[in-house]
Amino acid sequence: MPRALLSVSDKSGLIAFARGLADRGFELVSTGGTAKALESAGLPVVAISDVTGFPEMMDGRVKTLHPKVHGGILARREHVADLDAAAAHGITLIDLVVVNLYPFVKAAANPATPFDALVEEIDIGGPSMVRAAAKNFAGVLVVVSPADYDTVLTQLDRPDGPSREFRFELARKAFAHTGAYDTAIASELDAVTYHDEKFVRGTTQGYPASITLGLRKRGDLRYGENPHQHAAWYAEESPVGLGAAQRLQGKELSYTNLLDLDAALRIVLEFGEPAAAFIKHTNPCGAAIGSRASDAYVRAREADPLSAFGAVVGLNRPIDLEAAKAIVSTKIDCVIAPSVDPEARAILAAKSQMRVVITDIEQLEQLKTRDVRSVLGAVLVQDGDRVVEAATPWPSNDLRVVTKRQPTTLEWNAMRFAWRLCAHVKSNTVIFTNVSQTLAIGAGQMSRVDAVNVARMKAGNDSLRGSVAASDAFFPFRDGLDAVADAGATAVVQPGGSMKDAEVIAAADEHGLAMVFTGRRHFRH
């Protein structure tokens, strides 16, 4: 009788799979909660303690670390000496190992999980069994994902049993599974410090001496930025982020869709108010806040209706009926939001080619972002850039009014809005806004004067009189500030820090502008 060992944290599909194994003549050996679940379903189960002759002990820390378990997994079926050793020591062969690991990643994703509790989610016996079975894939099937249960049963029904190729594919998945698991543990522990005689999570500054990225393939992409470039996308084991987003309708997401969705989310996450961002080539062409999602959407679209055509759009509120009506009135490529109301689904379905994606915005708020980029022969890693001032009422002690004229309340609110946006536009950038809507965006220019001129060109016949301007970095000379004033802005927010700050401040005073220094630069390359 073939023997299967089952020990899983994720019990989805477990009972049906175990019943399928039992129907095919397998003896079921199991541990702890898995055994209880199988017994409750009426399946015959051999307890792991009956196999080892030792009880499960130390709160389940020691269950499967025993020669009668690992010998049964590692014995090579084609080696007579291995089989003789197993027989001499009363070791029964194990033909199938079904294991998925303690939910460390889920526990680590919750900042409130205490360090001691997190340590208890580090699986020891599970990875050992998985690696042993994967090493001996020629004789043992190893299953780490419920998604493979049906395929395993189908393979078992083959006249000559599971193919060697299939066995190897399961082994490859198993090693990737344990590798990603160990990477998640190492990454989490890298952010732990010892302080006041206790371990504290998420407090380490800087980066470790080595980094291993544990990523799982989500799928192949049709192509990269251009048709001649092959592409795929991968995601961390984290339950949040674009890697966990759900596509409700439309074509498969493309490489550029994913880049633009990321850009859209980064912007709308800056706002507590209903917000919308229209993205083209990772730059916003329009962004706005409003009283509700539909209001924010329409205002963002009207900021640059020409560029809005074919854009990717992000919302930080559910798509309701009114928002859906506004969305289908525009030709856009993709929209992402926290959810879609049922009555809105039918409206959106009329644009069947439009991609509609949902993701949990609240969980994304807690996501610690790190930007990883490849350069020739190396990889660069940095903390993600969020405008932390977004949560602070303006004015605040972190901000410095450097001009003779103080900003009005309306200008303060408009600058706060503009500052949250300019961090997400390619440098050099100068943007013009009112209190709730972009008016003109000068993005990705080689000089700050050019950025202002591009913004003025984008504004066209629409006046920028009475607007505020935000610059992602300091004005190196007064010419950029003169251009801002000539465009019609009445207030400017910028980091400051130029050797020519005094000249720039003098220019602002000459024009009667109010100007605020934040002391923080927001380059985006």
Residue ranges, per PLM feature:
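Hydrophobic beta-strand scaffold residues
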Residues: L28, V45, V140-V142, V356, ...
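Mobile "lid/hinge" segments at catalytic clefts and subdomain interfaces of large enzymes
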Residues: S128-M129, N136-V152
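N-terminal glycine-/serine-/threonine-rich phosphate-binding loop
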Residues: M1-V51
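Anion (oxyanion) recognition and catalysis
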Residues: A22, E39, D123, A134, ...
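Non-catalytic interaction/clamp surfaces of large macromolecular machines
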Residues: A147, T151-Y207
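Glycine-rich nucleotide/cofactor/substrate-binding loop typically near the N-terminus or early
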Residues: G33-F104, D196
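Active-site/ligand-binding-proximal alpha/beta "capping" segment
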Residues: R77-P127, R131-A134, V401, Q406-T409
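ATP-dependent carboxylate/acyl-activation modules
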Residues: M1-L6, V99, Y181-T183, V192-H525
